Every structure is written in C-alpha cells, then in structure tokens.
Amino acid sequence: MLIIIRPSGEIALKSPRSRRNFEHTLANNIRSVIKEGKIWRSQGVLFLEVNDDNKNIEELSKVFGIASFSPVMSIKSYNNNLEDIINKAKEVFAEIVKGKIFSVRAKRIGSHNFTSLDVQRKVGEALYPFSRGVNLENPEVEVFIEIRNDVAYFYHKIIKGPKGLPVGVAGKTVVLFSGGIDSPVATWMMMKRGSIPVILNFNLGGSVHRKFVLEELSVLRKWSGGHKLKLFIVNGTDVLIKLSQIEKRNRVVMLKRVMYKVAERLCDKANVKSITTGESLSQVSSQTMTNLYVTEYGIKYPIFRPLIGFDKEEIVELARKIGTYEYSIKLPEYCAISTKARTSVELDEVLKDEENLNIDYEKVLENSEVIEI
C-alpha cells in the first residue's frame, strides 16, 4: 500500500532549512511508529510504502505534524499521455462512483500538455456512465487525481491527521503530571507543538495513583511520534507530612510550589528548558491569578500552561478525544489537600513557610522512581 502524507500547513511556511528539518523529523517519527516499509520526501509531501494494514492508518492518524493522508494507487504517465490517466481512473473509480453523484478533483505539479481542468472534465466523462450524475458543489463521493511530474496518483479518501508540529522539533519540557483530567491534556498539547514531555509525578495515592498514571502515559505514548516518555515518580507522602507544619489554608499553594521547585531541579538535571502544567485560570483556588504568581515566584524556567483559557468542558472533550479521560476520571483529586484553601495567598507568608520547611528538593528528586515508557 502506498500512502501520500501531507505535512501540516505551517511546516510549508517555514524557511527552506527549517522545513527540511521539520519534514526530516516527521519522517523519522513515522518510521518509529510504523516500524516497517519505506518513506521518502517529494515536493512538499511524504510517501510511505507499507503492507496493506489498517493498523498503519490508525497509527498515522496520531502522528503530530500530519495534516492529512491518503492511500493511493499510481501509474507512470509517459509522454503526458492523458489517455493512460483516464483508463486508470476508470479502473480505480468505476465501482466507487457506481450509482452515486460524484465529482472529480485534480491537481498537477510539473509541465504537462493538459490542464487540471482537462483531467477533471475527461475523467468525469469517462466515469459518468457508471454514476448517478455529477455535482461539483455537493457530491456524494469525491475522487482525486494528483499528477506529480510523470506519475499520477488516484485516491478517494482524505484521512485527517492531528496537525501540529512533529514531536521533537521544539525540545523537551518537564510536565507536572498529577494524572487528573487536565495534566494529560496539557501534555498532549505540548506534544502537538513539537515538544517531548519529561513527566514528573508526585505520588499522593500509592499503588492506585501509580497504576492510573502509567495507563494514561501508555495512551499518550501513542501520540508521541515514537518517542519514549520518561517518568519520574516522587514520593509525595513525605512532602505532605512536611506541609502539615503550616497553616492548612496555605497547603495547596505550598504543595504546588514544592512541585515547581522539584520540576526546576529536574530541568537542571535533564537539560530541559521549560516547565508545563495543566493549570487553567481560576478553575480552582490554587489557580487564581494571585496564587499562580505566588506559586511560580522565583522559578527560573518559563512555565507553559496550554490550558490557561480552557473551561472544564473543553478540557474533558479533549481528554475523551485523546483517550485519557477513562483513566483520569477514576483518580481522586489527590492535590486537593485542603477544603478551605485561600484564593489569594500572600507571597511573604509562603516564602516564610518555605524557609521554615527547609525541604531538600534535590533529595526529593534523587529518591524518585524513574520509568521509561
């Protein structure tokens, strides 16, 4: 089976050098995911030759950087022979348009002694006897012919990809991953922008928490373009014991600040240049403008919050699409360690608590469990 793969539109807008780099990364990611066949680049698209397997279709639909793709049949059209194209179109499309209202879409790259309109008209005439009629505006079925120099490609399906950028072109980011609904979606969105996530989980729920986090990451791994996901699991119970020393209403913000501090150390250790969270503005008390300011105060790495403007319904909808929702919904809200958390914590108060707690963030990270998925 031959598949034509169309990269995301924004890749075509890059400089020639960046475009080559992005397309090269996309090709490598496809190789890692499909694990078979032959792939090559040609005039703004990629071609993939694989065994006839529907599994490949499903896997390609989760590779970021792909706008769409189509299984195709092809012929060499020597000497600009339009008759060859018409005959092949009848062979490929006669059954597809049978008893249906159809349209023909054609486009060309290269020099030919006929136009795209000629192809549409002549192929349409040849297929008309098999059909129920032609309607260019609202057909029941569309058939496509793409002529690239001396090769013509025939297809009738355009399968959508997830678009975005190939995973790996934007470096790495440390993701604070609770395993709730939000953090897997934030991870997915950063992968969509070409980033490889390094996962940091504070385990506050023992083996159950660990189990569901691993299941969620197994789902996200299918979207990673073949890149392995590295997971650091920190024993959050020890941190909670420390936090019991401070005022109860400040504990949620302080817990988040501890997570940021450990994430900062992980960035140092893994040579990562950013931190990502699943926070959404004003969704909960720790995510008010004031508390976000306090939480990230003094952190030296940029903090990305891809869900900052999303409401919960939008996040849930994405989680269902990704496939993580069925696991996230089973997890308790482990980070909700106070029922009366403040919506506006004073920075000076938090910094004083931080000094008194004297948490060794390096040691917290050193004692983490590391898993590669």
From Swiss-Prot:
Binding annotation for ATP: L176, F177, N201, F202, K256, G278, Q287
- Would I find S-adenosyl-L-methionine among this entry's keywords? no
> EC number(s) of the enzyme?
2.8.1.4
Cellular compartment(s): Cytoplasm
Q: Which GO terms describe its cellular component?
A: cytosol
Domain of life, per UniProt, equals: Archaea
The record's InterPro entries line, in alphabetical order, gives: Rossmann-like_a/b/a_fold, ThiI_AANH, ThiI_fer, ThiI_N, THUMP_dom, THUMP_ThiI, tRNA_STrfase, tRNA_sulfurtransferase_ThiI
Q: Fetch the CDD domains from UniProt.
A: PPase_ThiI, THUMP_ThiI
- Catalytic activities: [ThiI sulfur-carrier protein]-S-sulfanyl-L-cysteine + a uridine in tRNA + 2 reduced [2Fe-2S]-[ferredoxin] + ATP + H(+) = [ThiI sulfur-carrier protein]-L-cysteine + a 4-thiouridine in tRNA + 2 oxidized [2Fe-2S]-[ferredoxin] + AMP + diphosphate; [ThiS sulfur-carrier protein]-C-terminal Gly-Gly-AMP + S-sulfanyl-L-cysteinyl-[cysteine desulfurase] + AH2 = [ThiS sulfur-carrier protein]-C-terminal-Gly-aminoethanethioate + L-cysteinyl-[cysteine desulfurase] + A + AMP + 2 H(+)
In terms of PANTHER family, this protein maps to: TRNA SULFURTRANSFERASE
**Classification via NCBIfam families:** tRNA uracil 4-sulfurtransferase ThiI
What this chain does, per the entry, is described as: Catalyzes the ATP-dependent transfer of a sulfur to tRNA to produce 4-thiouridine in position 8 of tRNAs, which functions as a near-UV photosensor. Also catalyzes the transfer of sulfur to the sulfur carrier protein ThiS, forming ThiS-thiocarboxylate. This is a step in the synthesis of thiazole, in the thiamine biosynthesis pathway. The sulfur is donated as persulfide by IscS.
This protein is called what?
Probable tRNA sulfurtransferase
Source lineage: Archaea, Thermoproteota, Thermoprotei, Sulfolobales, Sulfolobaceae
